[in-house]
Amino acid sequence: MLFMLRWTTAGESHGQALISMIENLPAGLSVSREDVSYQLARRRLGYGRGARMKFEADEVTFVGGVRHGKTLGSPVAVMIGNTEWPKWTTIMSADPIDESDPEVAKEMASGRGAKLTRPRPGHADFSGMVKYDHDEARPILERSSARETAARVAAGTFARALLREVLGVEVLSHVISIGRSEPYEGPSPEFSDLEGIDASPVRAFDSAVEESMIDEIKAAKKSGDTLGGIVEVVVKGLPIGLGSHVSGDERLDAQLAAALMGIQAIKGVEIGDGFEEARRRGSEAHDEMEAAANGGVHRLSNRAGGLEGGMTNGEELRVRAAMKPISTVPRALKTVDMATGEAATGIHQRSDVCAVPAAGVVAETMVALVLARAVLKKFGGDSVEETKRNVQSYLEYVDTRLDWSAEANDVADGEVADGEIR
């Protein structure tokens, strides 16, 4: 575990900057600030986003680990500056403040600086205030905010580059449903469809369900409410054998589920047909196999979503995540004032009506990071070229292993071919 791909983030929602750290990437990956900015812009997409998306910009700086557009093999650090920081320098100051100063006292007593003692139901406010012994929610909500996912998206840009350069695969997502909208039930999109998906106001693959999603958001906004939904992440072209069956924490499905559940507001994850599988009989639940004429295996279905026994099986990886409605509800919910114990309504700051389209981009990020870690664990490599050589050697082995011709099987079994033991 010590030398596996690792990532972490630091920073608060209204702090000076967010920081993303990625360790144990191979040298030679091609990643630019423009690549990171592009993914961050995708994270801001979607009908139903709040005003904050309009005036906040993501200022990307590579602090370390990259030179001339290539990773060095050392830890990578990315900083995403907060363009609104001048408005928050006192309230979010890392240094002690002098509240005897009239100007400081005024700023801390009203507006942005006022103590937030009314925790929002569904948010981290209440449990965090009790656990960390804070007298207000500001120290909790600043870190628990989904703004933190911007730093994850930055890290995920490097994971995407690894998957692209080493395996030639891409990660994409689309929105299945929002609220009670008609769900999408068609085939999975191809990566070539991504531009069209991102052009959709709700990141829908099918225009037929797009209108239903938009109507849901309009209705929620009109009634002062918020909405959740379901996103699907799709990855095609993964090799057989990423992950492992040998222990629970090495199962790729467990890692994917944990990574997706770690996204703010995600309350459920399913792989493949997921919960629908529980309603089927065994004879209808599993993906039967046939030997393909040109070698390899052909599946008659992909209900497993590309994972069996904690490992990729060569089929399309398909993972869904369910996002609950945003906790900051304009029509404020009942709560208790933690300063007095009196009945109150939850604090309300600017928020989105629906962030499901953006959640899809964050879900892509987490899937990419988990897959990149699995790739490096299986194939290793201090440089991209070394990792590619290792991948190529393995793929050649798989092709030979699944070549059903009699001669190939004889060679694989160590029998004589052309007068030699191979």
Curated annotation (Swiss-Prot):
User: What Gene3D superfamilies does this protein's entry cite?
Assistant: Chorismate synthase AroC (3.60.150.10)
Q: One of this protein's Pfam families, by short name?
A: Chorismate_synt
Query: Can you tell me which residues bind NADP(+)?
Result: R43, R49
CDD domains listed in its UniProt record: Chorismate_synthase (cd07304)
Q: Name one GO molecular function term.
A: chorismate synthase activity
The Enzyme Commission number assigned here is 4.2.3.5
Cofactor list: FMNH2
The record describes the protein's role as: This reaction introduces a second double bond into the aromatic ring system.
Any idea what this protein is called? Answer: Chorismate synthase
